[in-house]
Amino acid sequence: MRLVPLDCAEQVSRWAARYIVDKINAFQPTAEKPFVLGLPTGGTPLQTYKELIKLYQAGEVSFKHVVTFNMDEYVGLPPEHKESYHYFMFHNFFNHIDIPVENVNILNGMAEDVDAECERYEAKIRSYGKIHLFMGGVGVDGHIAFNEPASSLSSRTRIKTLTEDTLIANSRFFDNDVNKVPKFALTVGVGTLMDAEEVLILVTGYNKALALQACVEGAVNHLWTISALQLHRRAVVVCDEPATQELKVKTVKYFKQLEQNIAR
């Protein structure tokens, strides 16, 4: 695992955006060989999307030959609902870049047969061979995507019941009314994420410190699904200083020294 400790959330966003752009450009995608990018929603990646838009507007990257797969979607919210992840992605990112709409893949939370929808999504990912880079965030309880605590670490795309902690955390998007938050979501599995060639996780804020500790210093544990990244061959975790508060001082120092050596 590569841990990149930075000073603040703004630096995390800029670093992640530059990393993604460099990966896309190095890949030299074409219509026949697209770069496949996994994407999250939520507050943590929002600034990264803004930075990616800036880099696109500056002519440093094109998304014309990029195919995206989003992590998750609420069950029961139509795409036009302002709190659906369809709406979030188009409003905050896709509408501002040159990605063809047919290259965008987001789970259908309105599907009549959600199991079939999840199987279709997995098959679509397989049709491209693999996801080259999957960006994600982490919940305060260590969940990635909607793989809540005690999720199988080999799980695939499926429907999940959201925990009370997640409902409370997401209620800020629903008039602070936990009863308005959908109780179910479709989500890629931990196994789906682990199949990606590379995983890039953004961790910011004091409230994510325990999750980061579980990810970096804890044992692999299904109660902290983020800990599965320890088994990934190419996992990159980018964090700000507040998120490192529960890590040992020597752990942070170790990874900072590694980054200094990489920069030389």
From Swiss-Prot:
The protein's name in its UniProt record: Glucosamine-6-phosphate deaminase
Active site: 72 (proton acceptor), 141 (for ring-opening step), 143 (proton acceptor), 148 (for ring-opening step)
Record-annotated site: Part of the allosteric site: 151, 158, 160-161, 254
Role this protein plays: Catalyzes the reversible isomerization-deamination of glucosamine 6-phosphate (GlcN6P) to form fructose 6-phosphate (Fru6P) and ammonium ion.
One cellular component (GO) term of this entry: cytoplasm
Gene behind this protein: nagB
Pathway(s) it belongs to: Amino-sugar metabolism; N-acetylneuraminate degradation; D-fructose 6-phosphate from N-acetylneuraminate: step 5/5
SUPFAM superfamilies cross-referenced by the UniProt entry: NagB/RpiA/CoA transferase-like
